[in-house]
């Protein structure tokens, strides 16, 4: 029988630990605080911002939102970032992506203080991952995949893992993280030939394509562990992943649902990183 790997159970366990840690920080008169930088007024960004603020409020994490014009000059953005980097009460900084085209992505990412880079956007923090150092900040989404597997006692050692994504947000950092856990990893992408023949041989398949229900049962074997990272909207306006969940769920060993899967853990790990930063900087 297929095991459903619910992320909300993992998130709840992490939050229970965070509550205890936040209480200890309060005893030192330290309140974890996140600065959010949003450029423009995209509905998706605003919805995500509200979700983060709500999650922070539940754990008594403070937030400071900087609503910026989409045409903000890079010079002005960097001045604001410098100010936030120097503000002692701010423990974490989150900049919403993608950036407006006139801003240099590497310049923006490099402007975030390393000790406040809670979503691991700074090139030096990413470099640490590729050197095998997972003790600092790591990107929240790849970490969520790892945390779910650990929670359900799925050992990565010796496993063959296929990741269908080659971005610096998910695929590349996740590949380094599973390598550090002694797995063997294959990265696939849109130009990969005969993808099902590759994924079907894997022990674990991680998909982050961004195409609703694209991945069907022929991509898996009966023991496949399926980690669906994407959050898409189907033809009926309902949230779904890359995997055709209803048709696949009884034909694999284990699978994460969408929603209540990887996404719920991703947001919780962002909160954890804020608390981590507050503890390190206290």
From Swiss-Prot:
<keyword id="KW-0368">Histidine biosynthesis</keyword>
<dbReference type="GO" id="GO:0004477">
    <property type="term" value="F:methenyltetrahydrofolate cyclohydrolase activity"/>
</dbReference>
<dbReference type="InterPro" id="IPR000672">
    <property type="entry name" value="THF_DH/CycHdrlase"/>
</dbReference>
<dbReference type="InterPro" id="IPR036291">
    <property type="entry name" value="NAD(P)-bd_dom_sf"/>
</dbReference>
<dbReference type="GO" id="GO:0004488">
    <property type="term" value="F:methylenetetrahydrofolate dehydrogenase (NADP+) activity"/>
</dbReference>
<comment type="subunit">
    <text>Homodimer.</text>
</comment>
<keyword id="KW-0554">One-carbon metabolism</keyword>
<feature type="binding site">
    <location>
        <begin position="165"/>
        <end position="167"/>
    </location>
    <ligand>
        <name>NADP(+)</name>
    </ligand>
</feature>
<dbReference type="InterPro" id="IPR020630">
    <property type="entry name" value="THF_DH/CycHdrlase_cat_dom"/>
</dbReference>
<keyword id="KW-0511">Multifunctional enzyme</keyword>
<protein>
    <recommendedName>
        <fullName>Bifunctional protein FolD</fullName>
        <ecNumber>1.5.1.5</ecNumber>
        <ecNumber>3.5.4.9</ecNumber>
    </recommendedName>
</protein>
<keyword id="KW-0378">Hydrolase</keyword>
<dbReference type="GO" id="GO:0009086">
    <property type="term" value="P:methionine biosynthetic process"/>
</dbReference>
<dbReference type="GO" id="GO:0006164">
    <property type="term" value="P:purine nucleotide biosynthetic process"/>
</dbReference>
<dbReference type="Pfam" id="PF02882">
    <property type="entry name" value="THF_DHG_CYH_C"/>
</dbReference>
<keyword id="KW-0521">NADP</keyword>
<keyword id="KW-0486">Methionine biosynthesis</keyword>
<dbReference type="GO" id="GO:0000105">
    <property type="term" value="P:L-histidine biosynthetic process"/>
</dbReference>
<keyword id="KW-0658">Purine biosynthesis</keyword>
<dbReference type="GO" id="GO:0005829">
    <property type="term" value="C:cytosol"/>
</dbReference>
<comment type="function">
    <text>Catalyzes the oxidation of 5,10-methylenetetrahydrofolate to 5,10-methenyltetrahydrofolate and then the hydrolysis of 5,10-methenyltetrahydrofolate to 10-formyltetrahydrofolate.</text>
</comment>
<keyword id="KW-0028">Amino-acid biosynthesis</keyword>
<keyword id="KW-0560">Oxidoreductase</keyword>
<dbReference type="GO" id="GO:0035999">
    <property type="term" value="P:tetrahydrofolate interconversion"/>
</dbReference>
<feature type="binding site">
    <location>
        <position position="190"/>
    </location>
    <ligand>
        <name>NADP(+)</name>
    </ligand>
</feature>
<feature type="binding site">
    <location>
        <position position="231"/>
    </location>
    <ligand>
        <name>NADP(+)</name>
    </ligand>
</feature>
<comment type="pathway">
    <text>One-carbon metabolism; tetrahydrofolate interconversion.</text>
</comment>
<dbReference type="Pfam" id="PF00763">
    <property type="entry name" value="THF_DHG_CYH"/>
</dbReference>
<dbReference type="InterPro" id="IPR046346">
    <property type="entry name" value="Aminoacid_DH-like_N_sf"/>
</dbReference>
<dbReference type="InterPro" id="IPR020631">
    <property type="entry name" value="THF_DH/CycHdrlase_NAD-bd_dom"/>
</dbReference>
<comment type="similarity">
    <text>Belongs to the tetrahydrofolate dehydrogenase/cyclohydrolase family.</text>
</comment>
């Amino acid at each position: 029988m297929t095991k459903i790997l619910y992320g909300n159970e993992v998130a709840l366990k992490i939050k229970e630990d965070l509550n205890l840690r936040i209480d200890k920080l309060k005893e030192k008169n330290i309140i974890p605080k996140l600065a959010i930088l949003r450029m423009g007024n995209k509905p998706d960004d605003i919805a995500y911002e509200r979700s983060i603020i709500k999650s922070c409020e539940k754990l008594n994490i403070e937030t400071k939102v900087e609503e910026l014009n989409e045409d903000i000059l890079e010079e002005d953005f960097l001045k604001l970032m410098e100010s936030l980097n120097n503000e002692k009460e701010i423990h974490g900084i989150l900049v919403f992506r993608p950036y407006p085209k006139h801003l240099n992505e590497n310049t923006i990412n490099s402007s975030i203080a390393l000790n406040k880079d809670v979503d691991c956007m700074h090139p030096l923090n990413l470099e640490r991952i590729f050197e095998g150092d997972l003790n600092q900040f790591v990107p929240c989404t790849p970490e969520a995949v790892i945390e779910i597997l650990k929670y359900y006692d799925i050992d990565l050692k010796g496993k063959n893992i296929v990741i269908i994504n080659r971005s610096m947000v998910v695929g590349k950092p996740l590949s380094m993280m599973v390598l550090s856990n002694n797995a063997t990893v294959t990265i696939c992408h849109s130009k990969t030939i005969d993808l099902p023949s590759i994924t079907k041989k894997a022990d674990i398949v991680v998909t982050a394509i961004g195409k609703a229900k694209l991945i069907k049962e022929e991509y898996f074997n009966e023991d496949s562990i399926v980690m669906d990272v994407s959050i898409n909207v189907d033809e009926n306006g309902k949230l779904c992943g890359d995997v055709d969940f209803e048709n696949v769920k009884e034909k694999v060993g284990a699978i994460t649902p969408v929603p209540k899967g990887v996404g719920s853990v991703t947001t919780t790990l962002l909160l954890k990183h804020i608390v981590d930063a507050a503890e390190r900087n206290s």
